[in-house]
Amino acid sequence: MERVVERVAVTGAEAVANAMRQIEPDVVAAYPITPQTPIVEYFARFVADGVVRTEMIPVESEHSAMSAVVGAAAAGARAMTATSANGLALMHEIVYIAASYRLPIVMPVVNRALSGPINIHCDHSDAMAERDSGWIQLFAETNQEAYDFTILAVRLAEHEDVRLPVMVNLDGFILSHGVEPVEFYPDELVKKFVGELKPMYPLLDTEHPVTWGPLDLYDYYFEHKRQQIEAMENVKKVFPEIAKEFEETFGRKYWFVEPYRMEDAEHVMVALGSTNSTIKYVVDELREEGYKVGSLKIWMFRPFPKEQLQELLNGRKSVVVLDRAVSFGAEAPLYEAVKSALYEVAARPMLGSYVYGLGGRDIKPEHIRKAFEDAINGNLIADEQRYLGLRE
């Protein structure tokens, strides 16, 4: 099949909605919440116009949305939803249940600060609150990645050695409402790539009746959690295989992380999401000035790519970690994960922790440069949490 792409200028929300259109899930249940709302608005239009045959369920809350897709997935349907911030927090109970039931649900999460005070703009507090829920978590830098990851996530979630739900994270407003060029793949090619869902133990298979969600006490609960752990570990084996097939089909290469100008870099910055575009801009500037700097974008936050970080960051002079979320009373989430991964390497770099952009505060090139300059000048202090763009 010929790979002919359509290059269009769209928002991240429209890009994700079009990926959902091409996937054509059996069921989508959703409740509107800023800045996720345009995703389900676009998709609801596809349903109303008869473009897709998806059963669209408008529910009264995000708790109900996740409950509905859990029920649909357990019945054997390919099910999706989308949310942001307080909506994800309201889902919290059922988010854990979806993972523990091993249901291959795909959920775009348009990242927004959690209340309070109430805030509708971007940070990663919503996703970080669910990082231990058992969901695979992918983070997009661009609208193209948000589109691609939505498609790729279906295959990853439904793989027989994984069977775990996936969150596709895209930064609120920055990506969801920002317009960028995106290459849409042919509908037939996407449908061929995602294939047909092969349900496991569906409730509607009356020839093989099963019970979902029974009481699971100390006689089996522990073993079931161990199975979840093993499934998450399997992602590290399965993801490269699916990513390779994605590259062969669509021409784009994905991995757990994306190194940028890392070949001889002495000082490296690590971050999630759209901020990586600004980091790359500053890396290019500093390279022109003769500084050996680079960046490492984390595409997959859960499971955390520990081995890849150890390989790429061992022996560097310094590593600066940027977090768009905090963990009150502890180290920032991404910094904590990077620090833990590098504890085992032979030549540990100096580490620096920087929190930025809470509540949608802009992160500017001069902020990135300041953090790099601290690293270059040897001014990093391990475990000292610093802040970029904060009035103090």
From Swiss-Prot:
The keyword S-adenosyl-L-methionine does not apply. GO terms for molecular function: pyruvate synthase activity. It catalyses: 2 oxidized [2Fe-2S]-[ferredoxin] + pyruvate + CoA = 2 reduced [2Fe-2S]-[ferredoxin] + acetyl-CoA + CO2 + H(+). InterPro entries: PFOR_II (IPR033412), Pyruvate:ferred/Flavod_OxRd (IPR050722), Pyruvate_synthase_PorA (IPR053390), Pyrv_Fd/Flavodoxin_OxRdtase_N (IPR002880), THDP-binding (IPR029061), Transketo_C/PFOR_II (IPR009014). Transmembrane segments: none annotated. One of its GO terms (biological process) is response to oxidative stress. It holds the Pfam family PFOR_II. Keywords: Oxidoreductase. Heterotetramer of one alpha, one beta, one delta and one gamma chain. This is Pyruvate synthase subunit PorA. The lineage of its organism: Bacteria, Thermotogati, Thermotogota, Thermotogae, Thermotogales.
